[in-house]
Amino acid sequence: MITPQEALTRCIEHREIFHDEMLHLMRQIMQGQISPVMAAAILTGLRVKKETIGEISAAAQVMREFANKVPVADRENFVDIVGTGGDGSHTFNISTASMFVAAAAGAKIAKHGNRGVSSKSGSADVLEALGVNIMLTPEQVGQCIEETGIGFMFAPTHHPAMKNVAPIRKEMGVRTIFNILGPLTNPADAPNILMGVFHPDLVGIQVRVMQRLGAKHAIVVYGKDGMDEVSLGAATLVGELKDGEVREYEIHPEDFGLQMISNRGLKVADATESKEMLLEALTNVPGTPREIVSLNAGTALYAANVADSVEDGIRRAREAIASGAAQEKLDQFVRATQQFK
């Protein structure tokens, strides 16, 4: 089996670390069996040579092995809405707002998230600001999914082995393979996913990684204005896995009868501002927040196979917002999480 030194040499020579070797290497890193210096060197080497689909798939497989799983009985219309973050756009939590709308329209959501690292407000930060208890056990998350159709999995609770890697990542302070592994390692094993990424190259890579990991319907998006969401301010690159086949294409707001609007008005300074904008969208206040949430929730409903198309999904999302069902879903979710305090 490959040694850490051999793995580093491969990276320096821009050669691939093969699947079984990567499994072995990642298990060692996750268990703290490789020194911090060597682990940091390998993570840097992988980034410089550019991680391959095979390397990312193997690394994600190991993270899933080490995760505390969430028990879910009914997996139909079950979807994760997640972003890699790191897009530098500092917008409000669009995917978190979209989760309540999609759930109100019939999807089941298993959202996997954390506190903000590069963003002003991570999904965990805004959910806490809304009154959600994020410190649930895997069993309690499963119960929330049963009761409300939504589960939020706070990453540190579900990935305890990351404690061996966290200090290394923090000291390095640069992007590593772990930045793209989070969205691939849903502890509830959601078979469908809407994933936003921070770089156009990742669209084709991540959708093919999801294919290798056995996803059913995966939609990976990158807004050409730099957003890790479906954008209103520019075209969005899409990688879609459906029925075992991968397609890559572009979508535009106008395709769905939406006006192209700059995302500048979506920027926030902290979790409190993000909460206010999220509530605007859910309570049907006309404006860009409501429009971008309708677009992303609609795409999530298509990914969850609740809607036949993104257009159909947007229509369902708008209905969920206008009827008050999305706001009620948020209130229901807050109550469900608070019962475990």
From Swiss-Prot:
One of its GO terms (molecular function) is anthranilate phosphoribosyltransferase activity. InterPro entries: Anthranilate_Pribosyl_Tfrase (IPR005940), Glycosyl_Trfase_fam3 (IPR000312), Glycosyl_Trfase_fam3_N_dom (IPR017459), Glycosyl_Trfase_fam3_N_dom_sf (IPR036320), Nuc_phospho_transferase (IPR035902). Anthranilate 1 binds at residues 83, 114. Its cofactor is Mg(2+). One of its GO terms (cellular component) is cytosol. Binds 2 magnesium ions per monomer. It comes from the Bacteria. Mg(2+) 2 binds at residues 228-229. SUPFAM superfamilies: Nucleoside phosphorylase/phosphoribosyltransferase catalytic domain, Nucleoside phosphorylase/phosphoribosyltransferase N-terminal domain. Keywords: Amino-acid biosynthesis, Aromatic amino acid biosynthesis, Glycosyltransferase, Magnesium, Metal-binding, Transferase, Tryptophan biosynthesis. It catalyses: N-(5-phospho-beta-D-ribosyl)anthranilate + diphosphate = 5-phospho-alpha-D-ribose 1-diphosphate + anthranilate. Mg(2+) 1 binds at residues 95, 229. Belongs to the anthranilate phosphoribosyltransferase family. Catalyzes the transfer of the phosphoribosyl group of 5-phosphorylribose-1-pyrophosphate (PRPP) to anthranilate to yield N-(5'-phosphoribosyl)-anthranilate (PRA). Homodimer. This is Anthranilate phosphoribosyltransferase. It comes from Cupriavidus necator (strain ATCC 17699 / DSM 428 / KCTC 22496 / NCIMB 10442 / H16 / Stanier 337).
